[in-house]
Curated annotation (Swiss-Prot):
Belongs to the universal ribosomal protein uS3 family. This is Small ribosomal subunit protein uS3. It comes from Borreliella burgdorferi (strain ATCC 35210 / DSM 4680 / CIP 102532 / B31) (Borrelia burgdorferi). InterPro entries: KH_dom (IPR004087), KH_dom-like_a/b (IPR015946), KH_dom_type_2 (IPR004044), KH_sf_prok-type (IPR009019), Ribosomal_S3_C_sf (IPR036419), Ribosomal_uS3_bac-typ (IPR005704), Ribosomal_uS3_C (IPR001351), Ribosomal_uS3_CS (IPR018280). Pfam families: KH_2, Ribosomal_S3_C. PROSITE patterns: KH_TYPE_2 (PS50823), RIBOSOMAL_S3 (PS00548). It comes from the Bacteria. The gene is rpsC. Keywords: Ribonucleoprotein, Ribosomal protein, RNA-binding, rRNA-binding. HAMAP family: Ribosomal_uS3_B. GO terms for biological process: translation. One of its GO terms (cellular component) is cytosolic small ribosomal subunit.
Length: 293
């Protein structure tokens, strides 16, 4: 069976950025990577009551002893807590875990209807609350499309409705071009913990194509990606070519009809003038003969 690559990792440095931003010696790489895993796990464990409100966790390191954590959420107030109590507790917890200075920032999601992770979290939360998965999926689909999404695909899998055999259910609307690298595809995955087992939710959200962006290649060279020609432009160019061909054919026809450097109409007009001139001359000659006689 064909498998799908993660849409985010496929587009890193094309129209997506890294979620962990740091660079260290290769000897420290595994330790730093493990710290990133611990940071994300501890934050989600601490905020398990509002885990469905977390879209992403970004980690930035400018030096080995300082870590900046950015929590992306559509509800900053619930993450911050009363007078910043949650942030303070999270900072103390992470400092104890990794023994480094922690700085926590909050980034708000302005349009949660166009965030694939938030959509997946919302569906998982409603499925946990025993809502009808068909209604939930169709409602999420219509809401996102009305808010401006160009395409959306949602897939849910597991023991749906408490069935004995696990199966999957999928809804889709619009375009979701997963093989187009310039397409801005947002991807989200969440799990619903039900009495029948875990139900997985996957969301692919197409926000449009990103054109004219400068990116770094694997060799570090800057490449200016030129916009691809749209279908409308191709049709216009095709019509223009047809018009040019028709004009060329008409011109060729006029050239074939020319006689002594004149067009057919001009030749006909000249013949008429010659005929009328000769007719008037014959008439004048006959009048002179009558007068002389």
């Amino acid at each position: 069976m064909g498998q799908k690559v993660h849409p985010y990792s496929l587009r890193v440095k094309i129209n997506k950025d890294w979620k962990s931003k740091w660079y260290f010696d290769k000897k420290l790489y595994s330790a730093i990577l493990h710290e990133d895993f611990l940071i994300r796990r501890e934050i989600m464990k601490f905020l398990k009551g509002i885990k469905f409100d977390i879209s992403d966790i970004e980690i930035i390191r400018n030096n080995p002893q300082k870590v900046t954590v950015v929590i992306v959420t559509p509800r900053p107030g619930s993450v911050i807590g009363l007078k910043g109590s949650n942030l303070e507790k999270i900072g103390q917890l992470l400092t104890k875990k990794i023994s480094k200075k922690i700085s926590i920032k909050i980034k708000e999601v302005k349009r949660p209807e166009l965030d694939a992770q938030i959509i997946a979290n919302g569906i998982a939360k409603q499925v946990e609350n025993r809502a009808s998965y068909r209604k939930v999926l169709k409602s999420s689909l219509s809401t996102s499309m009305l808010k401006g999404a160009q395409g959306l695909k949602i897939k849910i899998a597991g023991r749906l409705g408490g069935a004995e055999i696990a199966r999957s259910f999928e809804v889709k609307e619009g375009r979701v071009p997963l093989h187009t690298l310039r397409a801005n595809i947002d991807y989200g995955f969440s799990e619903a913990q039900t009495t029948y087992g875990i139900i997985g939710v996957k969301v692919w959200l197409f926000k449009g194509e990103v054109l004219g962006r400068q990116t770094n290649s694997d060799a570090g060279q800057v490449i200016n990606k030129k916009p691809f020609r749209e279908r409308g432009d191709a049709v216009k160019n095709f019509d223009k070519t047809l018009n040019n061909r028709e004009k060329a054919n008409e011109k060729q026809t006029r050239l074939l009809d020319k006689k002594d450097g004149l067009s057919k109409d001009e030749v006909d007009l000249l013949n008429k003038k010659k005929f009328s001139a000769s007719f008037s001359k014959e008439r004048d000659d006959s009048n002179e003969q009558d007068i002389g006689g």
